[in-house]
């Protein structure tokens, strides 16, 4: 009996060692507060207070060990009101002076025009499991630096939040437009003693956002997060309208020294011989190089105070933010007598005027003439256009051409001596039809798990057929196989195999007609992707006729 008890005890110990050591969150925000203030003189203040308790070494050493605060000292002042750590036993460890490290933001490292930007790295000290970080700081913007009060504040963090408070304080005039997206919590309106108005949201027990939430493009990730319903977002602005907000931005899109622009167009026109299409191609090739990482500085509009350098200055410097490069692109095309304009993409709210400049997620150039051998701009935006606002700089709605709206077909042909036909032992030939890798954007990024906990917005709908024709190698016989078809509410997957004369034709079709996936509809999408990724559906076997 004693021996049995020992065995049982050993088994329990083994089971315990196999169980996860920690099933809770990495950390927890006891309180996260953001207070936006617009003063009568036009200056603004963003005050952030956070109380964050750490539960794991990953949170302590990586995720929350440092806080990064970017600001522009030419127009903004950073004030650290309080920074300390309260250890588990109650001991207070104040952040020492040498733990406030001011550096150049990495995104501005190769851009002398933006080397004035600073990033304050607050290195939290005295950390241990169970410790709580307290940080309270303000970024104060000088009058005139920002055109209006503009708020775009995602709520959910990677860790749960016990209490989230967002307050917006302004003069009673101009009117404040505001909205909380994807969360049912009314705003509390308050009048302060000094004849000002406050709007405040208090959200409790906010669940964390998924750690590996799938999005396709950094610039459009907020669209996918918000439009899916996963991410609550507070938007607010004192601009009288969205069109008025764009008017202030439109004033930044200027050519500057037009002689510099025309000189560049003349240089690019060499070899075009007066051919309009060749000139468009030359401009497209030049801008493709500029849009690459070599010339594109990953600063957002808000990082530069919604200000742009003139196109001529961007041309001379050889680099620019995305918005600056778009301005240069359009200026070059217009100087060459080509048609081009600027397209603005922003978050969609229930009322257009609730969104200001901070809600802009993408800016790109739309051309009347397509450049050859150059990626078409705005394709990712076109795939998501029903989930965001798309306008020109005057606020007029813009409809983008969507390349996935119609059924597309791609054809491949393998000759009998094609190097892609592998020879196996016994003279057996193996061929892999095309198509599987063409939908990696969906199958690899959005079908990693068998289920999801939060809604997911796919980057596109999809309808594409891939036809591979394989010429029969001489003296070989095709090993017949049956077709496959799955049809459900999300779309369909079809594989057919036909023999005609001296060839085998493999037809693979993938249709995904449901872009917004919920936890209940996701299994249908996963079933399609699982079938589409099955290697066996693409393989053809040929055996020697003598076998």
Segment roles from a protein language model:
Residues 23-547:
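A sensor for short, sequence-defined functional sites
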Residues 9-18:
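Bacterial N-terminal signal peptides
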Residues 1-4:
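Positively charged n-region of N-terminal signal peptides that target proteins for export
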């Amino acid at each position: 009996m004693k021996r049995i008890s020992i065995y049982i005890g050993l088994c329990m110990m083994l089971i315990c060692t196999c169980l996860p050591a920690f099933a809770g969150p990495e950390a927890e925000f006891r309180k996260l507060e953001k207070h936006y203030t617009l003063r009568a003189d036009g200056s603004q203040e963003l005050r952030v207070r956070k109380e964050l308790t750490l539960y794991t070494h990953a949170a302590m050493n990586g995720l929350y060990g440092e806080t990064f605060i970017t600001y522009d000292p030419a127009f903004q002042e950073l004030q650290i009101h309080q920074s300390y750590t309260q250890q588990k036993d109650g001991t207070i460890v104040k952040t020492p002076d040498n733990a406030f490290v001011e550096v150049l933001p990495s995104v501005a490292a190769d851009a002398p025009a933006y080397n004035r930007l600073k990033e304050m790295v607050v290195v939290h000290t005295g950390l241990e499991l169970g410790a709580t970080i307290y940080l309270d700081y303000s970024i104060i913007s000088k009058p005139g630096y920002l055109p209006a009060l503009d708020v775009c504040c995602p709520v959910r963090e990677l860790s749960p939040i016990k209490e989230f408070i967002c307050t917006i304080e302004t003069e009673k005039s101009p009117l404040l437009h505001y909205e909380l997206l994807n969360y049912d919590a009314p705003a509390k309106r308050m009048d302060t003693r000094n004849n000002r108005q406050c709007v405040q949201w208090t959200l409790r027990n906010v669940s964390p956002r998924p750690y590996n939430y799938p999005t396709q493009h950094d610039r459009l990730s907020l669209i996918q997060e918000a439009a899916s319903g996963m991410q609550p977002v507070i938007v607010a602005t004192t601009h009288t309208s969205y069109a008025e907000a764009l008017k202030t931005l439109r004033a930044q899109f200027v050519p500057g020294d037009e002689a510099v622009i025309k000189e560049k167009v003349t240089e690019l026109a060499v070899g075009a011989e007066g051919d309009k299409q060749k000139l468009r191609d030359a401009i497209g090739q030049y801008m493709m190089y500029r849009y690459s990482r070599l010339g594109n500085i990953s600063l957002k509009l808000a990082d530069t105070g919604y200000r742009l350098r003139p196109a001529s200055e961007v041309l001379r410097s050889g680099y620019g933010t995305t918005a600056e490069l778009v301005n240069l692109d359009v200026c070059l095309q217009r100087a060459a007598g080509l048609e081009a304009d600027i397209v603005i993409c922003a978050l969609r709210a229930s009322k257009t005027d609730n969104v200001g400049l901070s809600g802009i997620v993408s800016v790109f150039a739309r051309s009347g003439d397509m450049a050859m051998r150059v990626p078409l701009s705005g394709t990712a935006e076109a795939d998501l256009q029903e989930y965001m606002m798309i306008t020109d700089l005057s606020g007029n709605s813009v409809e983008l051409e969507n390349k996935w709206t119609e059924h597309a077909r791609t054809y491949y042909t393998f000759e009998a001596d094609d190097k892609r036909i592998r020879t196996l032992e016994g003279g057996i030939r193996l061929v892999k039809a095309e198509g599987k890798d063409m939908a990696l954007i969906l199958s690899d990024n959005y079908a990693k798990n068998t289920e999801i906990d939060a809604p997911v917005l796919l980057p596109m709908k999809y309808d594409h057929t891939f036809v591979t024709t394989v010429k029969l190698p001489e003296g070989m016989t095709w090993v017949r196989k049956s077709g496959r078809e799955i049809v459900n509410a999300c779309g369909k997957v079809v594989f057919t195999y036909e023999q005609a004369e001296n060839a085998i034709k493999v037809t693979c079709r993938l249709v995904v007609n449901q872009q917004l996936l919920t936890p209940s509809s996701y299994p249908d999408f996963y079933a399609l992707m699982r079938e589409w990724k099955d290697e066996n559906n693409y393989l053809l076997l040929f055996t020697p006729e003598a076998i």
